[in-house]
Amino acid sequence: MKLIEPRNLKGFRDYLPKDQIPRSIIFSKIKGVFERFGFEPLETPVLEYADILAGKYGVEGEKLMYRFKDNGERDVAMRYDLTVPLARVAAQYQNELPKPFKRYQIAPVWRAENTQKGRYREFYQCDVDVVGSAVGIADAECVAMVEEIFFELGIKKFVIKINNRKILNAIMLTAGVSEEKILDAIRAVDKLEKVGPKEVASELKEKAGLNSKQAEQLITLASTKISDINALKTFVEENILKQPQAEQGFEELNSVFVALKAFGVKNALIDLSLARGLDYYTSTIFETIITETEDSKKYGSVAGGGRYDQLIKLFTGKDIPAVGISIGIDRLFAAMQDLGLIQNKGIVSVLILNLEESLQKEYLKMLSALRKAGINAELFYSLADIKKQFAFAESKSIPYGVLLGLDEAKKQAVTLRNLETRKQKTIKQKSLLKELQKLLK
């Protein structure tokens, strides 16, 4: 018989317990903050009709979609993000959902992109969105929530960059970009931090039809450092006020920052070069970068999103405002590993060692009592060398071991061992539960 080589597709991976346990802890903390902010869970299918997803992500995003014909010759695609499926849900169930509708979803998405550290073709997103609320508090709440999540995960240094697509559009028009080329110019500017001004200028000339002077002006305007909302007002008045969207963009961003100040958010700043490459953004956009690492570009954006007031209209024919933000858990996890924030923690608290054949019933009774008391416990299934059983406990990061041999059984006692410090003490069997509950608080 020819053996099948066990292997993964490029960009896809397994999560063994040593990785999945801390990931689950991170998911749980994120979910806790989501629910604290009033967001409710939603699940959507992996597969959607291709026309639901197509045309929402721009030319480059379209190339990354996993799209194929299923067994019924239907044109289908695997979800590229969680936002467009939400837009479909908001339209499909618009008469059943509360208004505004605040939802979160934690699920994998698929993109056929180049792989690198922290970037995969299958990866999880943690999304929150508010459907049915105009620009202002809802946008600020998304930002405040991300800040709280990062603090809760132990990340101290990060920035949440914020911009407004209307202001960015006004910059584009001021520099000479035509209306029909704005999205092409936005996709170019979106790469400014990754590839630098020279490459962006080249793409602006090639894709957006600008000459060298116009490209330079656009990059200069978009690279202007804005210290606060008052500085933004001055920038708008001095540079782009002639464009019809400029004033509205400023007023929208101002309303967001008024709410952010009330929320007490400290890590948000205005970045006029922030573009976000997806086509459906219409107003506020955000992006979060971890700055604790030596190279803040290493993982790219670990959280990003924005307002998409016209996306749901594609399904309903009417404007329904919406805003959301997504956390890329794989990039976040990779960064947290480098920062030493991932604890090697198991889910089992106690291992009962298997030392005597004649004591099997006692082991099982003890195991059952611990579990019924809410303690995660397991028994080493077979008789084995004690060193082997300790090694098993260490491999699973189990903190405590319970030893019951013939001598302890005669005295109705057990030995409770701290498997990390190797300190142990003998206690009465009836005291074991109370002792463990005290240690595991």
Specify the residue positions occupied by each region the protein language model found.
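Acidic, His- and aromatic-enriched active-site or binding-groove loops in soluble protein domains
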Residues: 63-72, 177-198
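Short, conserved phosphate-binding/catalytic loop or strand-edge motifs used
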Residues: 120-126, 162-170
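Positively charged, Gly/Ser-enriched RNA/tRNA-binding surfaces
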Residues: 22-37, 48-49, 72, 83-94, ...
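Auxiliary tRNA-acceptor-end handling modules of aminoacyl-tRNA synthetases
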Residues: 1-20, 178
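Hydrophobic mid-domain F-helix/FG-region of cytochrome P450s
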Residues: 145-152, 166-174
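Polyanion/phosphate-binding surface patch
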Residues: 42, 46-76
